[in-house]
A protein has these predicted regions:
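Acidic/histidine-rich catalytic neighborhood
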Residues: 475-535
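Well-ordered alpha-helical segments within folded domains of soluble proteins
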Residues: 368-378, 442-453, 520-530, 584-593, ...
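Aromatic-residue-lined binding/catalytic grooves and analogous aromatic/hydrophobic interfacial grooves
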Residues: 1-436, 454-456, 474-477, 529, ...
């Protein structure tokens, strides 16, 4: 039951820092000796503003590409898509600022830095002779403010200041530090980033100005306050309480943040003053009550979990089951800290980014990454944390309808590889060569809906099904139906098709990323139509139910390669990378439940062969995805091997290049792509749940993929299908005690013990 991250030295980089958040504000806290740093984010601070994505020639380009693919002219089809069926790139998630607290101490005798994940409270304590400093920090969701309590002895001067890489100013007013600024209008005219003195483009024209932002810092203290320029100085204080609040002018994904932005001047001041009026003790209690009420809904523990080591040492030695408990709890902690009701969905880095030009813009990559962020959320019984994802899907659908009609010429909703806070749904690429491999992926909305489908199956909320899920699901189904191509045998498929980011080699040696159809697209179409049939029956929509069944029966079936694998494309091409990180052709195994060892044994065997050929290496999220897949194949030892690969210690800054084979975990337990990418943390938590309990309809599989190493343990509070919760306690890998706590709408269950 390891729920604390602890270190005996300050962080030297982001990958060693400890994270705080409330779904709106995020902080990476370094625990510095001389100078403490809080690297701050505000979840709505992005470049740019909403823009239309017109493409009057898109329909003709698509039709031409379809004809070329049908004739086997892959290279020509790819060029048509890149030149005639691509639009602007996504915008960028930005850092807000860094808050520095300088107490002038340069050495220490003792030091501890801990994050209590159960309470969401971070503590830093250190001494140097008779001098001591203690800092306690949290970010409150109920009060939308960061609070830092400093207790110190022997510190004559404490300085507090704010810096930002964005266009900004910091000034003082009464007893406050005030940060104001404007985000850049940040365009990718050729897919490249342009900077002037490290800053992206800014414009004087109001119509091209980006988001406004404001942050206010105020202190309570028992010393003397003065200002030295824009530096706050507090003399001879042994107790200081720092309050910080921030907001942007973001006013919705369809409104210009500068011309139609939300009011922030008074809003930030009001948030801050309400928090200060509440007082530190009341704020802390409200925060802990809120945070622990979410964190405590589920629990996971294993025997042989004792350890007195610091977190980075546990990770390096990897001898105790404590590490798996930490992995589970970190995923849960990050979910609660980054995704809360009324906020934004988690991006590639959750809500934590300190780079003005982050990897992949820290955007929403929706060919797996955003979806993986929310894989465990519903099973963890965190509907408050899942709400931003539902809102993301609903907002994306609004722009997705425009793209379906204007680019494809059909009614419905469609999205592609990337999105951002402005909910772009168009294929990006901006006519750049080689982008078709990933940018044309056009079944992402179907995958996004998988998470919403799981929410209904687990919560059994018919009103949610009727008012939210079913309308989106049927729109998605209608899109695919309208876009289906039919072959001479009557099989239906989407064409052209990608298998995200993967390529094969043409006979002339050219790598290419589109084919007549792909296993992944077919699987998503099947999953969407199968769910549409299931839910049409529940809601009594008989006409659509029968219609969807007819299309469902005709979707191109799986094919097996000559060496026994799931065929990824329309034929057996020479693969460019047989160990490619994406295993998209196994979508039917996970996240969908179309391929299972009990219902489709031959396909399960082919999926297993596919995974063996792909191998156990990859990026952090790739390894986590494969762990989920091996759990679905009831191979707990192989799933654990993948988790062990993900738990490989990665030394920060050792290799600043992007890696597609390394994976691993940074000292602060964040997933390493490398670089940092948060999805693997959630994928790992999901895999642990899948190893211990799986649902398929009313069949509940108990310990379906229990590894030998987890001889005894317990998992509690996991939400299962039909609106119920399950606790499982097992001893010596065999005996299992199971408790199911139903809600009002719970089902009858068939319990199947697999171990």
């Amino acid at each position: 039951m390891n729920k604390t991250l602890k270190f005996n030295a300050p962080a030297t980089c982001f990958e060693e820092s400890l994270l705080l958040g409330n779904g709106f504000l995020g902080a990476a806290v370094y625990g510095g000796i001389e100078v403490e740093r809080y690297s701050m984010n505000e979840a709505t601070l992005w470049t740019g503003f909403p823009k239309d994505a017109p493409n009057p020639d898109g329909k003709e380009a698509l039709k031409k590409a379809q004809g070329l693919i049908a004739d086997g002219k892959h290279t020509e089809a790819a060029e048509v898509l890149e030149q005639g069926f691509s639009g602007d790139f996504s915008q960028t998630y930005l850092p807000l600022c860094s808050i520095y607290i300088d107490c002038g101490i340069t050495e220490y005798d003792t030091y501890s830095r801990t994050l209590d994940m159960e309470k969401g409270v971070l503590k830093v304590n250190y001494t140097d002779g008779d001098t001591s400093v203690s800092r306690e920090s949290f970010i409150s969701n109920p009060h939308r403010v960061m609070v830092v309590k400093i207790k110190q002895t022997g510190v004559p001067l404490t300085q507090i200041y704010i810096k930002s890489e964005l266009y900004h100013c910091v000034f003082t007013h009464e007893d406050k530090l005030i940060l104001r600024g404007t985000a850049p209008y940040y365009d990718h005219p050729t897919g490249r980033r342009y900077f002037t003195n490290k800053h992206p483009f800014y414009y004087e024209d109001d119509a091209k100005k980006g988001m406004k932002y404001k942050g206010v810092l105020k202190v309570e203290h028992n010393g003397e306050l003065r200002f030295n320029g824009d530096i706050m100085e507090i003399l001879n204080a042994d107790e200081i309480t720092v309050y910080f609040a921030a907001k942007t002018s973001f006013n919705g994904f369809e409104k210009h943040p500068y011309l139609e932005g939300a009011e922030i001047e008074n809003a930030v001041d009001e948030i801050l003053q309400k928090a200060i009026n509440k007082g530190y003790n009341a704020l802390k209690k409200a925060h802990i009550d809120d945070f622990s009420s979410l964190f405590g809904r589920t629990d996971f523990s294993l025997r042989n979990n004792k350890t007195d080591l610091y977190t980075d040492k546990i990770l390096k030695e990897h001898k105790s089951n404590a590490l798996y408990e930490l992995l589970f709890n970190v995923g849960k902690y990050l979910t609660i800290s980054a995704s809360r009701e009324g906020g934004q969905a988690m991006n590639l880095q959750g809500i934590w980014n300190e780079h003005i030009a982050p990897p992949w813009n820290s955007n929403y990559t929706i060919n797996i990454n955003t979806e993986m962020n929310y894989m465990p959320t519903t099973a963890l019984n965190l509907p408050e944390c899942f709400e931003p994802y539902v809102k993301f899907a609903e907002e994306l659908a609004i722009n997705g309808r425009k793209i379906a009609e204007e680019w494809y010429g059909v009614k419905g909703v469609i999205s592609h590889h990337n999105s951002d806070i402005w909910r772009i749904a168009n294929p990006v690429g901006n006519k750049c060569k080689g982008t078709h491999v990933w940018s044309f992926y056009n079944t992402s909305f179907g995958w996004i809906l998988w998470g919403l489908v799981e929410k209904f199956r687990m919560e059994n909320d018919v009103e949610y099904l009727k008012n939210t899920l079913y309308p989106l699901l049927t729109e998605c189904a209608e899109t695919y139906i309208a876009l289906f191509t039919e072959d001479e045998k009557g099989n239906l498929y989407l064409s052209p098709a990608t298998s995200p980011e993967n390529q094969f080699i043409l006979e002339d040696g050219t790598p290419i990323g589109i084919a007549k159809y792909s296993a992944m697209n077919n699987a998503i179409c099947r999953d969407i139509l199968k769910s549409a049939v299931e839910f049409a029956e529940i809601l009594g929509d008989d006409a659509n139910c029968q219609r969807y069944k007819k299309y469902l029966e005709k979707i191109m079936p799986y094919e097996i390669t000559s060496d026994g694998r799931i065929l990824e494309w329309d034929k057996e091409y020479t693969e460019q990378d047989i160990h490619h990180r994406h295993v998209s052709h196994l979508y039917g195994l996970h996240p969908a439940r179309e391929i299972t060892p009990y219902s489709t044994p031959e396909l399960a065997k082919a999926a297993k062969t596919s995974l063996n050929v792909r191998g156990d290496e990859g990026t952090g999220w790739c390894i986590a995805w494969k762990a989920n897949m091996w759990a679905r194949l009831f191979d707990g030892n192989r799933a654990l091997k993948l988790l062990d690969n993900q738990l490989t210690f990665v030394k920060p800054n050792e290799n600043k290049n992007i890696s597609i084979l390394s994976g691993g975990t940074y000292p602060n337990m964040l997933c390493a792509h490398p670089p940092f990418q948060i999805d693997g943390n959630f994928g790992a938590t999901s895999a642990i749940i899948e190893m211990l309990v799986q649902c398929n309809g009313n069949d509940i599989y108990i310990l379906p993929a229990l590894p030998d190493k987890w001889e005894s343990g317990e998992i509690k509070g996991i939400r299962i299908n039909g609106g119920a919760f399950i606790d499982i306690k097992w001893e010596k890998g065999k005996k299992a005690d199971v408790k199911i706590t139903p809600e009002e709408k719970a089902h009858n269950y068939n319990l199947i013990f697999k171990h």
